[in-house]
Amino acid sequence: MRTISVYLLFMLLTIGITNAQISSAQKVLVSVTDDWNSNTATLYLFDKTGDGWKKHRSVFSVSIGRNGLGWGEGVHPHQSGEYVKTEGDNRSPAGMFELDTLLYGLGEKAPDGVQIPYLPLTKLTRCVDDENSSVYNSIVEEDSLKKDWHSAERMGYVDPDYKYVLVVKNNPLRQPGKGSCIFIHTVNVPTSGCTSMDDEDMLALLRWLDPKKKTVLVQLPLDEYHRLRSEWNLPKLLNN
């Protein structure tokens, strides 16, 4: 009985944390796929209003990991099962994740109309995907610290995919093997785990973001979205 009580308390606490994250968010991106193995998705944007969530007029067709989705490590309760994201599995993370409202890009300055802070990528910018590194799942400048990794993305050379890059906070505790370097970026083709879209759609997304408003990404197969919508207090998808 004590074990059951502790488990129920844990579940209530984790659900409460998830609800707090979505409750404190003022903007949410919802990316839904047909199933776990689909590598395309539909992306909806929602703004919080006094009457609840209001869907933005734009709906985007996007690409995700070429092998589909796997449960990631975000602000949602821990999930297990057949589909769990690991390093190098070519799956995008499923769940709820904070979105870092800092834009990286290949140009010298942000596009017109973008409010969030901008940081140009350099030829030394790396995202470390070596799980044995002390800076695993981190973006660093290679000349700013002692190199202890054997594998990293050379972000300043990834053109045109990294023309614009937003960081999805998957695996923020940087647990080895749980996945690294998950972004939203340009070029709408299936990826190694990121969410990608056409330039025009990416610009619309970037101009919609507000640095003063907390933003989260919810990324799930459609059936899972419907299953969790009430529990996680998610917006209703009017077209589904």
Predicted stretch roles:
Residues 1-21:
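Bacterial Sec-dependent N-terminal signal peptides
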Residues 198:
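Conserved "landmark" site that anchors the functional core of diverse proteins
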Residues 195:
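Residues that recognize and position ribonucleotide moieties
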Residues 21-192, 202-240:
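Cell wall/extracellular polymer interaction/catalysis modules
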